[in-house]
């Protein structure tokens, strides 16, 4: 499949560019700014998108693209910094803006090249401190402001760019612009629901005659990965559900029940004592993730002794956002280690099999429904592999886990009909003693944080506006039913700047 390459220059919105292109029906993936012209040509991309970024295109140390790429005949679309980079490369002029622009801005379209069917006046999302003050010679200006060029294209419309961020939802017609550019060069080639056969074939070719061990968490990602792999290799897949003692209330029984209904042969391995012992005394969130990753591998190593033939591959439901946050994409910075990415030991003893690693959550859900997986499994709220360990701020103990399980069960029960909530982590601030009043006496206890969020892909998220009566009912139940908790707090921080999980 020919990709659209997204060269990431460090924008906070780069992941949204990939997602927006996919939503337009084209397969997109990241590329490093250091990619050479030869490497580009080898991939035969439909087009190249240049992302935004914090640098200034006119500075000597600014990240650049291999200039030979501009001579390869590959269509190129620049966004923000990428737009300025194109202006600089083709002889235009970029300077520091008289005033930076951050947030919504109204623009006027003066040439409909990629804006057919869009209003002449529209609101877009800006985030820049530099401006293009002169377009390259023989380029058509498509929109302007009082003192800057806001978009342009060359005469044959193969090189184009915009100063704003069309990938951000606040740019209402942004996806229309992206699709208008791409549709000039190729028909759509991406539908996650139509990738099932290709993914199954790829798994079959990769695995060959070897065996696969699946680290099944019970979430939609691992269930879809297991179902695809089972289609590819049948009984050579062995699924193991590791009970690490960090699960929610009754979760083990629920996972065993619905995996059995899907025809997956699942063995349960109780390793709760091992995990809790390894986590003893550890308070740092990154260290928790690393320890949990190592313990998972230790479990799988022990499990190998039960098999007549050792599995060669370890199957995981790693998704694209996991790779991005773990710094595993070209030029990416590590935001947090994921137990199934950066938390794994280099000495696995297995070769990783990650058939979903270039997909977003909503794409996986579409595939899950196409595979016939029940809706209540497909739309199950995401739950982190490290479990409740990263929802306890501080050291993990059995007592704290019991408190958090009870609070989490209350929240999940009260929000059971709120299907448009992407996720609602419940966090125990176990390092904080908060003062309360019970009866006529002073009391002390833990605060609990609830974090309901709405999202499409976990790359960005906003806090979910629950009605006050629902919040009051949740708070009342938690503080009345769990004596160790005296305070309930609502987290209203979007992502960015905060990640969805606290740790």
Curated annotation (Swiss-Prot):
Q: In the Enzyme Commission scheme, what number(s) does this protein have? A: 6.3.5.2
Catalytic reactions on record = XMP + L-glutamine + ATP + H2O = GMP + L-glutamate + AMP + diphosphate + 2 H(+)
User: Which InterPro entries does the protein's record reference?
Assistant: Class_I_gatase-like, GATASE, GMP_synth_C, GMP_synth_GATase, GMP_synthase, GMPS_ATP_PPase_dom, NAD/GMP_synthase, Rossmann-like_a/b/a_fold
Residues forming the GMPS ATP-PPase domain are 190-380
Where the record annotates domain Glutamine amidotransferase type-1, the positions are 3-189
Task: Identify which residues the record assigns to the active site.
Answer: 80 (nucleophile), 165, 167
Name used for this protein in its record: GMP synthase [glutamine-hydrolyzing]
């Amino acid at each position: 499949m020919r990709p659209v390459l997204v060269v990431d220059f460090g924008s906070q919105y780069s992941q949204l560019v990939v997602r927006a292109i996919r939503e337009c029906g084209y397969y997109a993936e990241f590329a490093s700014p250091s990619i050479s012209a030869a490497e580009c040509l080898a991939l035969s991309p439909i087009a190249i998108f240049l992302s935004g970024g914090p640098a200034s295109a006119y500075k000597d140390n600014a990240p650049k693209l291999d200039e030979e790429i501009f001579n390869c005949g590959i269509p190129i679309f620049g966004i923000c910094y990428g737009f300025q980079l194109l202006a600089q490369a083709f002889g235009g002029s970029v300077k520091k803006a008289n005033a930076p622009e951050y947030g919504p801005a109204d623009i006027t379209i003066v040439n409909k090249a990629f804006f057919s069917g869009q209003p002449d006046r529209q609101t877009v999302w800006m985030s820049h401190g530099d401006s293009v003050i002169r377009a390259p010679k023989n380029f058509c200006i498509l929109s302007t402001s009082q003192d800057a060029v806001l978009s342009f294209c060359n005469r044959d419309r193969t090189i184009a760019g915009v100063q704003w961020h069309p990938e951000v939802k606040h740019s209402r017609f942004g996806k229309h612009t992206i699709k208008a550019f791409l549709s000039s060069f190729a028909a759509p080639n991406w539908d996650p629901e139509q990738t099932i056969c290709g993914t199954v074939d790829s798994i079959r070719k990769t695995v060959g005659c070897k065996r696969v061990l699946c680290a099944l968490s019970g979430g939609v990602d691992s269930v879809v990965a297991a179902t695809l792999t089972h289609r590819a290799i049948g009984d050579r897949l062995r699924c193991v559900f590791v009970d690490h003692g960090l699960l929610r209330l009754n979760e083990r029984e629920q996972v065993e029940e619905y995996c059995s209904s899907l025809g997956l042969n699942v063995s349960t391995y109780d390793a709760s004592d091992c995990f809790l012992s390894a986590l003893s005394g550890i308070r740092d969130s990154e260290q928790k993730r690393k320890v949990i990753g190592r313990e998972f591998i230790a479990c799988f190593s022990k499990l190998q002794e039960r098999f007549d033939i050792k599995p060669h591959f370890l199957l995981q439901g790693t998704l694209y956002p996991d790779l991005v946050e773990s710094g595993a994409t070209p030029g990416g910075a590590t935001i947090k280690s994921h137990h199934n990415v950066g938390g794994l030991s280099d000495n696995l003893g297995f070769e990783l099999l990650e058939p979903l690693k270039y997909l977003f959550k909503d794409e996986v859900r579409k595939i899950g429904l196409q595979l016939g997986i029940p809706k209540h499994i497909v739309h199950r709220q995401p739950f982190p592999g490290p479990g409740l360990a990263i929802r306890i701020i501080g050291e993990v103990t059995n007592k704290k886990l019991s408190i958090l399980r009870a609070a989490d069960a209350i929240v999940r029960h009260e929000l059971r009909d709120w299907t448009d909530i992407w996720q609602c982590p419940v966090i125990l601030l176990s390092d904080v003693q908060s003062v309360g009043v019970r009866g006529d006496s002073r009391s002390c206890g833990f605060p609990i944080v609830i974090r309901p969020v709405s999202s499409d892909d976990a790359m960005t998220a906003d806090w979910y506006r629950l009605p006050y009566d629902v919040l009051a009912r949740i708070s009342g139940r938690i503080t009345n039913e769990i004596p160790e908790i005296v305070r309930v707090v609502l987290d209203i921080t979007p992502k960015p700047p905060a990640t969805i999980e606290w740790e």
